[in-house]
Swiss-Prot record:
The lineage of its organism: Bacteria, Pseudomonadati, Pseudomonadota, Alphaproteobacteria, Hyphomicrobiales. Its EC number is 2.3.1.275. The chain crosses the membrane at residues 9-29, 60-80, 86-106, 116-136, 153-173. The gene is plsY. This is Glycerol-3-phosphate acyltransferase. GO terms for molecular function: acyl-phosphate glycerol-3-phosphate acyltransferase activity. It comes from Brucella anthropi (strain ATCC 49188 / DSM 6882 / CCUG 24695 / JCM 21032 / LMG 3331 / NBRC 15819 / NCTC 12168 / Alc 37).
Length: 201
């Protein structure tokens, strides 16, 4: 049986590892490499895939989405070698790293793609629920933010009902953070001024 001190060090190490992996700003890196400048200067100013899509480059937006998801999935899978607690810690660290990346002044994305990536690594059935809810909501409304909010609210409930109580608690916490990070989007949704999927500028 592992000593409590070892468990604490492992969890701290997993959190730190996850944070630095999650803090890689792929949206910013990819748009600059493509010669599109600073993605933070357009649309919502966010470094995530939805804002990258506003450059008009769908392939770049897809690449951003995949890499931001992989940050969460890879963090979980690597840390899982040291136990489920380490996997959860690394996943949460990656999520926080994406939101508050040290490399760009702690001003990152809104965490949705990395949230999904962590979900894939910890409980992939929950990722199917997220994807289904997101797709249906996005098709009906054309609002990426609304789709993400509804999907992230459904996920913890689905996880708990499917027998993942510890992971459900983690995602309940992450969902609260996602909602907080979308407060400006929520205001725009209520005012009818939120940008729809595919809109430029």
């Amino acid at each position: 049986m592992a000593e409590p001190g070892f468990l604490s060090l492992t969890l701290i190490g997993a959190l730190v590892f996850g944070y630095f992996l999650g803090s890689i700003p792929f949206g910013l890196i990819l748009t600059r490499l493509a010669g599109l400048g600073d993605v933070r200067s357009i649309g919502s100013g966010n470094i995530g895939a939805t804002n990258v899509l506003r450059t008009g480059n769908k392939k770049l937006a897809a690449a951003t989405l995949i890499f931001d998801m992989l940050k969460g999935t890879v963090a979980v899978l690597v840390a899982s070698r040291y136990g489920p607690d380490a996997a959860i810690g690394a996943g949460f660290g990656a999520f926080i790293g994406h939101l508050f990346p040290v490399w760009i002044g702690f001003k990152g994305g809104k965490g949705v793609a990395t949230y999904l990536g962590v979900l894939i690594g910890l409980a992939w059935p929950g990722a199917l629920v997220f994807a289904a809810v997101w797709i249906v909501t996005a098709l009906l409304t054309r609002y990426s933010s609304l789709a993400a909010l509804i999907a992230s609210i459904v996920v913890p409930i689905a996880l708990y009902s499917r027998g993942y109580p510890a992971i459900a608690v983690l995602f309940a916490i992450m969902t609260v953070i996602v909602i907080f990070k979308h407060k400006a989007n929520i205001t725009r949704l209520l005012n009818g001024t939120e940008s729809k999927i595919g809109a430029k500028g």
